From Swiss-Prot:
GO terms for biological process: regulation of transcription by RNA polymerase II. Widely expressed with higher expression in breast, prostate, vulva and pancreas. Residues 71-113, 130-235 are annotated as: Disordered. Interacts with CBFA2T3. A zinc finger (C2H2-type) spans 245-268, 272-294, 299-322, 329-351, 357-379, 385-407, 413-435, 441-463, 469-492. This is Zinc finger protein 652. The modification Phosphothreonine is found at residue 103. Residues 184-209 have a biased composition (Low complexity).
């Protein structure tokens, strides 16, 4: 110990001489203090300190290099210690100071512990631990002195005692100390990095916007995602619950209960529901009208007693049929006018050549599905239209309409000018044009005008020579349907068996002894004149067939003409409807057939 004390005194004297020379050179600094021994607690910022422990009580030897530095705050007072070495080490230090390289290394070792400090701070900016650090790790560590904890001081004391007891292991101890220091430095580096990242996050200046509001460092999206992620299953469950909110009175589904309640208040509580059929109405008047009709098709027109199922159908009927509406919509092809656009679309099918609806029984094609449906009634024999007054059934609707005129007393459509009534609106419209003189349909070939389109088409066949009506018996074709009908009657009488009743036989003057066939007798013997007036030749009912008076006797101008045998007395064909004894021309059927007979007879004379 005496050797170490003497070496320390010599070292102190050398340092004091050096310091005194520096003080004399610097004229701006104050006087050098007389004594260099001070207490352990100093308020000055000391650059170098050398401590030595004697008899367990440390004392300090002060070497002043900064005499005029201001005093520091009391909170920054920290004791600094230096490790003691063996006598041999002290002499080595003296020799090394003569060399500049050794002195620089020594100064770095001395300033190593003085300039480095690591402060561990948590997220709340609270100090957790203070430890050593590397040189130049952070700007704060350069300015603050090194703080040592009590545990580190105890370790150093134990190390100094160990070095005093054994000088042989001095070099080994240095290496171990260096290794420990390296380990501590590595640990402190990690801690400083963590503390620096936390401090940067907490103490970094927040950016400002143009309005001076601070922006948060962490983006708000991350916070929202972090909060939404755990709530995702909960939200899905809520959505599933919302989707199950169904209305009890209708199959509608709602997302929230608010929408369901609103739907109940608006739709079901305010709607008027029929007790019989459950149909809903917005107005009470509509419900009362519906109940008066007993939920059936009984909404009748006051003018024509036509029944409808819906109220808007009745309004449309009143506008169209009874003259309250105008035909504002016209066809682009034929310029035909209609009351509604729906009627125009339905009419456009007539201009197309496609017939997609085909009858499975006979193969006939139609343009409209309704036409096929009506046609199929011919094969099935079904009569879906029933009269409510007499329970008579009909195959077509227009037949029922014609039949209803018997119960009503007049037909549905009546002319206000002449009082003539019609069962179908088509015939009524054609009749009204006779009063107005309107003939909108003009023949493209000759320019003749007609009141209806069917009449114009019928007239056009005279120019084109078209004969669309073939006979099923002989295959002959005709231009008009009435001509085909007359031809069928003629063919039927030619092919029928000859069974002439005695009431219809015409007496012929022949010799009783020699009976001769009527074919020969008609050519040689004179016959009484026959009145060709068809009215006088027809006996009372049962009326013979209208064509029975034709070709009974040949004319004298045609001697080679063979007479046709008489035809049996057949009843006339029944009328199409009981309530419609008139044909399409408005004449009696018998008169019409007689007119045809006269026409044919006159043609034969010529």
């Amino acid at each position: 110990m005496s050797h170490t004390a003497s070496s320390c005194q010599e070292l102190v004297e050398n340092c004091a001489v050096h310091v005194a020379g520096m003080a004399q050179e610097d004229s701006r600094r104050g006087q050098v203090p007389s004594s260099f021994y001070h207490g352990a607690n100093q308020e000055l910022d000391l650059s170098t300190k050398v401590y030595k422990r004697e008899s367990g009580s440390p004392y300090s030897v002060l070497v002043d290099t900064k005499m005029s530095k201001p005093h520091l705050h009391e909170t920054e007072e920290q004791p600094y210690f230096r490790e003691t070495r063996a006598v041999s080490d002290v002499h080595a230090v003296k020799e090394d100071r003569e060399n500049s390289d050794d002195t620089e290394e020594e100064e770095e070792e001395v300033s190593y512990k003085r300039e480095q400090i690591i402060v561990e701070v948590n997220l709340n900016n609270q100090t957790l631990n203070v430890s050593k650090g590397e040189k130049g790790v952070s700007s704060q560590s350069k300015e603050t002195p090194v703080l040592k904890t009590s545990s580190e001081e105890e370790e150093e004391e134990s190390e100094e005692e160990a070095t005093d007891d054994s000088n042989d292991y001095g070099e080994n101890e240095k290496q171990k100390k260096k290794e420990k220091i390296v380990e501590k430095v590595s640990v402190t580096q990690r801690r400083t990095r963590r503390a620096a990242s936390v401090a940067a996050a907490t103490t970094s200046p927040t950016p400002r916007t143009t309005r001076g509001r601070r922006k948060s460092v962490e983006p708000p999206k991350r916070k929202k995602r972090a909060t939404k992620e755990p709530k995702a299953p909960v939200q899905k469950a809520k959505c599933e619950e919302k989707e199950t909110l169904t209305c009890e009175k209708c199959p509608r589904v709602f997302n929230t209960r608010w929408y369901l309640e609103k739907h109940m208040n608006v739709t079901h509580r305010r709607m008027q529901i029929c007790d019989k059929c459950g149909k809903k109405f917005v107005l009470e008047s509509e419900l009362s009208l519906h109940q008066q009709t007993d939920c059936e098709k009984n909404i009748q027109c006051v003018s024509c007693n036509k029944s409808f199922k819906k109220l808007w159908s009745l309004h449309e009927h009143i506008k169209i049929v009874h003259g309250y509406a105008e035909k504002k919509f016209s066809c682009e092809i034929c310029e035909k006018k209609f009351y509604t656009m729906a009627h125009v679309r339905k009419h456009m099918v007539a201009h197309t050549k496609d017939m997609p609806f085909t009858c499975e029984t006979c193969g006939k094609s139609f343009k409209r599905s309704m036409s096929l449906k009506v046609h199929s009634l011919q094969h099935s024999g079904e009569k879906p239209f029933r009269c409510e007054n007499c329970d008579e059934r009909f195959q077509y609707k227009y037949q029922l309409r014609s039949h209803m005129s018997i119960h009503i007393g007049h037909k549905q459509f009546m002319c206000q000018w002449c009082g003539k009534d019609f069962n179908m609106k088509q015939y009524f419209d054609e009749h009204m044009k006779t009063h107005t003189g309107e003939k909108p349909f003009i023949c493209e070939i000759c320019g003749k005008s007609f009141t209806s389109r069917p009449n114009m088409k019928r007239h056009r066949r005279t120019h084109t020579g078209e004969k669309p009506y073939p006979c099923d018996v002989c295959g002959q074709r005709f231009r008009f349907s009435n001509m085909l009908k007359a031809h069928k009657e003629k063919c039927f009488r030619v092919t029928s068996p000859v069974n002439v009743p005695p009431a219809v036989q015409i007496p012929l003057t022949t010799s009783p002894a020699t009976p001769v066939p009527s074919v020969v007798n008609t050519a040689t013997t004179p016959t009484p004149p026959i009145n060709m007036n068809p009215v006088s030749t027809l006996p009372p009912r049962p009326i013979p067939h209208p064509f029975s008076h034709l070709h009974i006797h040949p004319h004298p101008h045609h001697p080679h003409h063979l007479p046709i045998p008489p035809v049996p007395h057949l009843p006339p064909p029944p009328a199409l409807f009981k309530s419609e004894p008139l044909n399409h021309r408005g004449q009696s059927e018998d008169n019409f057939l007689r007119h045809l007979a006269e026409k044919n007879s006159s043609a034969q004379h010529h």
